[in-house]
């Protein structure tokens, strides 16, 4: 199986012109597999030309058979059209993707991805869990300890304190710990940003930030191949490791979940690293269960 018709060497390139055909391919794979093979922000980056793609053109460039996508230094994302599988295309794309990016995501860690990873001597090096629970949530009675008050985020006032605590709380996290002032500004400019759903635990008196819970509402997407209802997310929950007060995570998580329920949402979700045992325990106590496993695979000889 060759990756391209004879005379056209395979090459990574930016592909805003091919974005519509690739979106159709990604939708078809998502509908067949029950999980989107390419994440939302990577799909946006294909459309804007910010990502590089390697396309398996199949029979015609308007109807691509598979794609690997590379964005910045992140693990690549790969999919093959459901009706073009088991023809060696995934193997070629994943091999090229790992050569370029060093790693590849497998959203949902489906049996085909596991089998292909094993055939290519790739091993799981990161497991990101998506956990969910129904809303509303019964009152759990978590109260802030003495000397701590919960208030909501005030744009224009709380950014620097938030970024400081976020960097400390997520010092070892591959993405969240890197958030800076401009990245925060971009998120706050999004339609979904809602300061009333962004809770801060502060000292009282003193108003020193100790911990935060930033919630995010994903609107329903009834159209398309993979329709979903609205979802409320525990987007970022972080406690300053220097705060020295236990229980702030539970207090803030409950407050945010009650807020999402008040907004009429019937499902809450969150993402957590599987090896973050304290966080997984906290979410299990709050009634969350694993909904989906997302795995980063790397060659066995790499760390
Ligand atoms: C994973 C995926 C890319 C494989 O694409 P593909 O073109 O079907 O894969 P290939 O034909 O190159 O398969 C190569 C090897 O992977 C393994 N494999 C692939 N699909 C398999 C399946 N459904 N069951 C068992 N083994 C499978 C086999 O070892 C296969 O070799 P073989 O056909 O000689 O037995 C495709 O199923 C897909 O798009 N899945 C959704 C997105 C995803 O999970 N991406 C992450 C990739 S790590």
Curated annotation (Swiss-Prot):
1D-myo-inositol 2-(L-cysteinylamino)-2-deoxy-alpha-D-glucopyranoside binds at residues 175, 216, 233, 271. Transmembrane segments: none annotated. One of its GO terms (biological process) is mycothiol biosynthetic process. Keywords: Acyltransferase, Repeat, Transferase. It catalyses: 1D-myo-inositol 2-(L-cysteinylamino)-2-deoxy-alpha-D-glucopyranoside + acetyl-CoA = mycothiol + CoA + H(+). Residues 148-303 form the N-acetyltransferase domain. The keyword Glycosyltransferase does not apply. Acetyl-CoA 1 binds at residues 78-80. GO terms for molecular function: mycothiol synthase activity; protein-N-terminal-alanine acetyltransferase activity. Disulfide bonds: none annotated. It is an enzyme of class 2 (transferase). InterPro entries: Acyl_CoA_acyltransferase (IPR016181), GNAT_dom (IPR000182), MshD_Acetyltransferase (IPR050276), Mycothiol_AcTrfase (IPR017813). Its EC number is 2.3.1.189. The keyword Acyltransferase applies. Acetyl-CoA 2 binds at residues 237-239, 244-250, 276-281. Monomer. Catalyzes the transfer of acetyl from acetyl-CoA to desacetylmycothiol (Cys-GlcN-Ins) to form mycothiol. NCBIfam families: mycothiol_MshD. Belongs to the acetyltransferase family. MshD subfamily. This is Mycothiol acetyltransferase. It comes from Nakamurella multipartita (strain ATCC 700099 / DSM 44233 / CIP 104796 / JCM 9543 / NBRC 105858 / Y-104). The lineage of its organism: Bacteria, Bacillati, Actinomycetota, Actinomycetes, Nakamurellales.
């Amino acid at each position: 199986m060759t990756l391209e018709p004879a005379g056209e060497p395979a090459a990574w390139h930016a592909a805003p012109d091919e974005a519509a055909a690739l979106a159709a391919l990604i939708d078809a794979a998502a509908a067949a597999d029950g999980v989107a093979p390419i994440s939302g922000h990577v799909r946006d980056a294909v459309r804007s030309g910010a990502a590089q793609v390697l396309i398996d053109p199949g029979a015609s460039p308007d109807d691509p058979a598979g794609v690997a996508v590379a964005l910045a230094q992140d693990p690549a994302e790969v999919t093959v059209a459901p009706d073009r599988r088991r023809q060696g295309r995934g193997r070629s794309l994943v091999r090229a993707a790992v050569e370029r990016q060093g790693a590849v995501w497998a959203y949902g860690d489906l049996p085909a991805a596991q089998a292909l990873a094993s055939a290519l001597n790739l091993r799981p090096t990161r497991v990101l869990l998506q956990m969910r629970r129904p809303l509303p949530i019964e009152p759990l009675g978590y109260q802030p300890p003495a000397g701590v008050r919960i208030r909501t985020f005030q744009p224009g006032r709380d950014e620097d304190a938030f970024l400081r605590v976020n960097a400390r709380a997520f010092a070892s996290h591959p993405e969240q710990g890197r958030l800076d002032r401009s990245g925060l500004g971009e998120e706050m400019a999004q339609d979904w940003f809602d300061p009333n759903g962004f809770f801060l635990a502060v000292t009282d008196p003193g108003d020193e930030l100790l911990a935060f819970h930033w919630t995010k509402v994903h609107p329903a997407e009834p159209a398309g191949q993979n329709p979903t209802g609205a979802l409320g997310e525990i987007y970022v929950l972080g406690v300053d490791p220097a705060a020295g007060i236990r229980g702030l995570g539970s207090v803030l998580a409950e407050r945010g979940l009650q807020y999402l329920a008040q907004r009429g949402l019937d499902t809450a979700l969150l993402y957590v690293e599987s090896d973050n045992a304290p966080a997984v325990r906290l979410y299990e106590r709050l009634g969350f269960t694993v909904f989906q496993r997302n795995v980063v695979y790397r060659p066995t000889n790499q760390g």
